[in-house]
Amino acid sequence: MMGLFPRTTGALAIFVVVILVHGELRIETKGQYDEEEMTMQQAKRRQKREWVKFAKPCREGEDNSKRNPIAKITSDYQATQKITYRISGVGIDQPPFGIFVVDKNTGDINITAIVDREETPSFLITCRALNAQGLDVEKPLILTVKILDINDNPPVFSQQIFMGEIEENSASNSLVMILNATDADEPNHLNSKIAFKIVSQEPAGTPMFLLSRNTGEVRTLTNSLDREQASSYRLVVSGADKDGEGLSTQCECNIKVKDVNDNFPMFRDSQYSARIEENILSSELLRFQVTDLDEEYTDNWLAVYFFTSGNEGNWFEIQTDPRTNEGILKVVKALDYEQLQSVKLSIAVKNKAEFHQSVISRYRVQSTPVTIQVINVREGIAFRPASKTFTVQKGISSKKLVDYILGTYQAIDEDTNKAASNVKYVMGRNDGGYLMIDSKTAEIKFVKNMNRDSTFIVNKTITAEVLAIDEYTGKTSTGTVYVRVPDFNDNCPTAVLEKDAVCSSSPSVVVSARTLNNRYTGPYTFALEDQPVKLPAVWSITTLNATSALLRAQEQIPPGVYHISLVLTDSQNNRCEMPRSLTLEVCQCDNRGICGTSYPTTSPGTRYGRPHSGRLGPAAIGLLLLGLLLLLLAPLLLLTCDCGAGSTGGVTGGFIPVPDGSEGTIHQWGIEGAHPEDKEITNICVPPVTANGADFMESSEVCTNTYARGTAVEGTSGMEMTTKLGAATESGGAAGFATGTVSGAASGFGAATGVGICSSGQSGTMRTRHSTGGTNKDYADGAISMNFLDSYFSQKAFACAEEDDGQEANDCLLIYDNEGADATGSPVGSVGCCSFIADDLDDSFLDSLGPKFKKLAEISLGVDGEGKEVQPPSKDSGYGIESCGHPIEVQQTGFVKCQTLSGSQGASALSTSGSVQPAVSIPDPLQHGNYLVTETYSASGSLVQPSTAGFDPLLTQNVIVTERVICPISSVPGNLAGPTQLRGSHTMLCTEDPCSRLI
């Protein structure tokens, strides 16, 4: 039983539900639109006692009455009782009234008017089913009548003119604006779907913007927007519904291109210049114009001027005129012509706004030159600096300030920056009348003493003014003077020594303090002035009582006068401005304690307790400096001396001949009268000469004078002068003699002290020179230095060579040229023996020259036919001569005799009465005796110059050189040789091959 009851209850519940489901209010709709009716038929499903919400839609703008009833409501209770149907809502009992009506018996709902969807998109009708008592048998339901839309409304833009802006140079596809348009037709319907498009663009040309068809977004088409080309654009835009196929409308879009700083300002002129007087300020000296294509009166256009160089003194400023954008150059600091005659500025310009990112990388500062010429004006005078401070020296009493000179304070002429002239100085403000200034020199000094408690002394300083008046223009300049004064102590105590002199054995003395009044009272403190660190302490002081102290030396000090600086301080710690200087004499005392030596106390000395010492005076210092200057000038004076005998101007330049007083010095050569010709002289070293295995001579100092294939050999201690042609060879011996050779095969050789060996060949001319020893009557006791003779003859030879060709030769060898067998006027085909003397010169005067020159005249005339006998030196002589590294020693003693032979054939021989001795070294460096010098001239047609003679410094003082011409000879073939049979004999024969040279 218990399980049957729940099952019965469940069955009853299911039955009630079924009944309720099958009992409903049905609404039927009818219409001519099948698809819509099919939609509404879905509402016929059974619901639990609910009204159907939808009715057949009605199209707006049409007469829908032909579709009545548009809906029908039915209640299930209609079958059992009378039901009355009623409707209410907008369009029924609310405005607009009477659009819908219902048949109260059948429930048919009819439309009676044309509806507008834009006014009422849908109608909500409340449906009720009433019984006879007027009570609702059904729950009221809402019936919705939808109004179908037609495309009766065009799109409407929210603005008739849309305004937008975009920066120039913006990137493409940048959003400019969004257009807004609406359509009154049903939303989300094709009738309200609007499509946008650009109808036109002003200015026309390349399309610059893109309009989105669906969203209405206006974007840039390119990145080439340029405000300088087009500052704004006007677009005509169309909006059409039904996605561009329906109704359309238009609007206007104005797009402004915003300016950016993409243009650099540029100066209109490449340079600027102006003039201004010095010492003048100017609010507008110059204007600079610039060109900027950016939008005017914006920060992109507004220029900012600045200096790049030249304004280091901050004389100028540049201000921008906001109306014209010009730069105004101002002078804010006066210019001085004396310091700056012209100013060269460099200016540049930029904009107030930063440059746009699209061009900032291309910006470069470009400077424009500006020249400012400063005009000089007469400036007058001024005090520089405008004030000056003077300080009164410490220790000066306020009662002793009269005529105390502080210094000078002169005005400056600003045109010259020097002390002004023609200026009169006067005092301006001079409180208390303490100061006075000299009207000419500007010297400031005190004219009266002052009281330190004076009201005119503020902070220990007196202030006054000085006026400088220009006497020409009357202009006045003012300067301020500050005088700092110390604390005057007019009653400081005075230190007095008990005695002025003390003994050096016990240098001590008592010092006492005294005052002029009782203002400063004891006890007094005594102290020595601080000494420099470099000076050790010499004195010390010890207080004895309230007014005195003991001054003593700390170490043994020498006698003298000492100056000691002492500082006194009273009980109130007041002291004098300057230390007191004490003078103390330290002296040597005798056993009685009395000074034995007195030192002047008035002489100046060194402070800090040191004795004064002597010092050099100005005269002594001047003499020292003069001596140093003379030492410095000595090398310079040596440069002006004539050192050496170099010729500078011909024969006479630098050459001094031997005085005429020297007897037998030299024979004149230039008697022939012909003109000399210079020849180059080559010095070579002569190797050893060997004849049949025997060495005749070696010498390290034997040199040859070679010209025209000839060779001359000079010995170490002899002299040889030769002139020849062909293969002529001469050799100078080792001991103060020389030989001369002839042309052709003639040879000469000398090898002994005081010996001359001469030879001549066939048909030639040989000239011999004999050297005869002698003495000078003025210099009989001395010997001429051979260094001097060597230098003398060398200089004379060079002087002759440098002589002008047009000048007649007076002292040089003259060579006969163009001589031969065909020569006219000569019996032998050449110059006759002494013919030039016999024809042109009366030589009878030679007979009266005295015995010394008698022999010389005979030799010159060719009268002498025998060799002269000369006495050789008493000592054996020998020389070691080195030639090219080979030593040789030659010695000859005895009487020497030289003879010259001539003939058509054969040879010449010279004989001596001596014999050849072994080589012996001679300790005596001097050579004594007579020496033979022979010289040979060639008879060929070439010109030959004499060689430079080399003299041995060991020869005797007086040397007589003679010359003789024998006769012309012809060349004899053969080489220079010494036959074996002649070795060791007293007579030697020398031959020479004219076509070969000495080897």
UniProtKB/Swiss-Prot annotation:
Tell me if Oxidoreductase is a UniProt keyword of this record.
Answer: no
User: What are the alphabetically sorted keywords of the record?
Assistant: Calcium, Cell adhesion, Cell junction, Cell membrane, Cleavage on pair of basic residues, Cytoplasm, Glycoprotein, Membrane, Metal-binding, Repeat, Signal, Tight junction, Transmembrane, Transmembrane helix
Q: Which Pfam families match?
A: Cadherin
Give GO cellular component annotations, separated by semicolons: bicellular tight junction; cell junction; cell-cell junction; cornified envelope; cytoplasm; cytosol; desmosome; extracellular exosome
The UniProt record lists the Cadherin domain at 50-158, 159-268, 269-383, 386-499
Q: What induces it?
A: Induced in the hours following cyclic mechanical strain in keratinocytes.
Q: Does the keyword Iron apply?
A: no
- Per the UniProt entry, the glycosylated residues are 110, 180, 459, 545
InterPro entries, alphabetically? Cadherin-domain_protein (IPR050971), Cadherin-like_dom (IPR002126), Cadherin-like_sf (IPR015919), Cadherin_CS (IPR020894), Catenin-bd_sf (IPR027397), Desmosomal_cadherin (IPR009122)
| Signal sequence bounds | 1-23
Functional summary from the UniProt entry: A component of desmosome cell-cell junctions which are required for positive regulation of cellular adhesion. Required for adherens and desmosome junction assembly in response to mechanical force in keratinocytes. Required for desmosome-mediated cell-cell adhesion of cells surrounding the telogen hair club and the basal layer of the outer root sheath epithelium, consequently is essential for the anchoring of telogen hairs in the hair follicle.
Quote the disease note of the record: Blistering, acantholytic, of oral and laryngeal mucosa: An autosomal recessive disorder characterized by recurrent, suprabasal acantholytic blisters in the oral and laryngeal mucosa. Skin, conjunctival and genital mucosa, nail folds, and nails are unaffected. Normal structure is observed in the scalp epidermis and hair follicle.
What does its UniProt record remark on the domains? Three calcium ions are usually bound at the interface of each cadherin domain and rigidify the connections, imparting a strong curvature to the full-length ectodomain.
Assembly and interactions?
Answer: Homodimer. Part of a complex that contains DSG3, PKP1, YAP1 and YWHAG; the complex is required for localization of DSG3 and YAP1 to the cell membrane in keratinocytes. Interacts with PKP2. Interacts with CTNND1; the interaction facilitates DSG3 localization and retention at cell-cell junctions. Interacts with CDH1; the interaction is required for CDH1 localization to developing adherens junctions. Interacts with RAC1; the interaction is required for DSG3 translocation to cell-cell junctions, organization of cortical F-actin bundles and actin anchoring at cell-cell junctions.
The protein's name:
Desmoglein-3
The gene designation is: DSG3
